[in-house]
């Protein structure tokens, strides 16, 4: 009898395969990084073939490390970086171009032109999203208009569009030999092409972006048996797909309206479950689908997205050379008592919620001769906490629900200094679960529910437990002064990129 569930966690910088037992405990995992491609300033690409090769490899490695064979897996779930868009040839399986990553801003002009007629919120009532280069629609439009032959192939059904989940499921289930061309409601809700009301592709949105319907995948539930794997090993049910942040919400067992989590990874993302009806945002958040279990109504969510958090640490490592490894940042930040008046605004590709400013760019401000690399490192960590507070305050205004605590997950939660400062600047406790990799866990839960490995949502709640809790300990006046300084720094990042630049 199968006694484990596997989860593919395909992220912005790496791909992992994690094997979970019935208690939601990690039995084994494998991970491989992939190249970040920067052809021009503001352009960010991934090689889809490299991502598939890495997925293939980590699935085999992870299963072997767990001491299991494919028949020991009750199901495989998939979670993925969202919005990242690609086209491939259904006959050969070859991508027509590198994938355009969610951070990519090459379509800023297209988005700005659309916003001139009705503003950035002109499609929010339909899609829940503001106009931004962040989402997939403008990326797909760019591929169709700039890749030779792409539009003709899309119109005759030769080319297929997908976010990364679609690409991987297609390859897992046969590729050119009958692979499934699907995406789940959470990923579809991030394309800016799906109606939140119907959970189907919206004809008006397809018209706006000139997208032929033939190129689009079928939209399916987040937890449902879709088919079986054929590669790298056969016969395991593919039972769940969730965009990475919705997967983390599911893994944190935020199944009731008002429950929220924040994931700290390459970017930072807060989501709150709002129940079976979408809640419109007036505070710069997006309305999205939280998940949909097979045969049930969907659950919706409010989300605030921060583009650069963990990626800022990578930038310190790779571009500035201030640290040799990402794990060194906490020690460097602890070498000073405070930020020394230094603030880092990591608007490398603009600012997301609640500002939505494509014209913002990164800055380091407040420098004096006193400042050193420790202050810069500390300011980089603090930037994550400040941005999180901005998003959570917007979430409270929209939902009318004050948050009593923040459930945290993702790779950066191992940084105790960051977690303590997060509690300090929020003035509320932050909690880290025993299984911090809740993104992969959420995908495993969705797949396991679909196959009956777990019977109910309460089974999943019973697995959740606190590993560590941080309580705020700074004075109110210090908190106010720190956050006011952040606000001044953010304002100075606006307007750096001119529309005709």
Swiss-Prot record:
Activity regulation as described: Inhibited by fructose 1,6-bisphosphate (FBP).
Reaction(s) catalysed by this chain's protein: glycerol + ATP = sn-glycerol 3-phosphate + ADP + H(+)
One Gene Ontology molecular-function label: glycerol kinase activity
Gene Ontology terms describing biological process: glycerol catabolic process; glycerol metabolic process; glycerol-3-phosphate metabolic process
Organism field: Methylorubrum populi (strain ATCC BAA-705 / NCIMB 13946 / BJ001) (Methylobacterium populi)
Residues that coordinate or bind ATP: 12-14, 266, 310, 314, 411
InterPro entries, alphabetized: ATPase_NBD, Carb_kinase_FGGY, Carb_kinase_FGGY_CS, FGGY_C, FGGY_N, Glycerol_kin
Protein name, UniProt field: Glycerol kinase
Similarity comment: Belongs to the FGGY kinase family.
This protein's UniProt keywords: ATP-binding, Glycerol metabolism, Kinase, Nucleotide-binding, Transferase
């Amino acid at each position: 009898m199968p006694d484990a569930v596997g989860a593919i966690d395909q992220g912005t910088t790496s791909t992992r395969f994690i094997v979970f037992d019935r208690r939601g405990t990690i039995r084994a995992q494998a991970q491989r990084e992939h190249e970040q491609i920067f052809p021009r300033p503001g352009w960010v690409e991934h090689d889809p073939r490299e991502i598939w090769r890495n997925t293939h490899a980590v699935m085999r490695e992870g299963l072997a490390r767990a001491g299991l064979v494919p028949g020991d897996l009750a199901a495989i779930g998939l979670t993925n970086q969202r919005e990242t868009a690609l086209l491939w040839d259904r006959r050969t399986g070859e991508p027509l171009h590198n994938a355009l990553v969610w951070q990519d801003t090459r379509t800023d002009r297209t988005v700005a032109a659309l916003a001139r007629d009705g503003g950035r919120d002109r499609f929010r009532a339909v899609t829940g999203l503001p106009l931004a280069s962040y989402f997939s629609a403008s990326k797909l439009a760019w591929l169709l208009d700039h890749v030779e032959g792409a539009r003709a192939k899309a119109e005759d059904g030769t080319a297929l569009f997908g976010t990364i989940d679609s690409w991987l499921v297609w390859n897992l289930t046969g590729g050119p030999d009958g692979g499934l061309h699907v995406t789940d409601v959470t990923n579809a809700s991030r394309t800016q092409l799906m109606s939140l009301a119907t959970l189907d592709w919206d004809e008006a949105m397809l018209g706006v972006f000139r997208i032929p319907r033939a190129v689009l995948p079928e939209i399916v539930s987040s937890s449902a048996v879709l088919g079986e794997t054929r590669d790298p090993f056969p016969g395991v049910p593919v039972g769940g797909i969730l965009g990475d942040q919705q997967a983390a919400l599911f893994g944190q067992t935020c199944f009731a309206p008002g429950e929220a989590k924040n994931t700290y990874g390459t970017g930072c993302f807060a989501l709150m479950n709002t129940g079976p009806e979408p809640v419109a945002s007036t505070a710069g958040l997006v309305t999205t689908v939280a998940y949909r279990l097979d045969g049930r109504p969907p659950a919706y969510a409010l989300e605030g997205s921060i583009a650069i958090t963990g990626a800022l640490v990578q930038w310190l490592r790779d571009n500035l050379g201030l640290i040799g490894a990402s794990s060194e940042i906490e020690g460097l930040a602890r070498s000073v008592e405070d930020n020394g008046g230094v603030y880092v605004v990591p608007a490398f590709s603009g600012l997301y919620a609640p500002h939505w400013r494509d014209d913002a760019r990164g800055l380091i401000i407040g420098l004096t001769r006193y400042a050193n690399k420790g202050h810069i490192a500390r300011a980089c960590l603090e930037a994550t906490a400040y941005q999180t507070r901005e998003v959570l305050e917007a979430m409270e205004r929209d939902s009318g629900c004050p948050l009593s605590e923040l459930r945290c997950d993702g790779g950066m939660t191992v940084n105790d200094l960051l977690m303590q400062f997060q509690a300090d600047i929020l003035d509320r406790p932050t909690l880290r679960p025993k299984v911090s990799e809740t993104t992969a866990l959420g995908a495993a839960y969705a797949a396991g529910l679909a196959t009956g490995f777990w019977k109910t949502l309460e089974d999943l709640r019973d697995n959740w437990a606190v590993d560590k809790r941080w309580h705020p300990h700074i004075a109110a006046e210090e908190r106010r002064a720190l956050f006011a300084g952040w606000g001044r720094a953010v304002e100075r990042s606006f307007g750096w990129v001119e529309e005709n630049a």
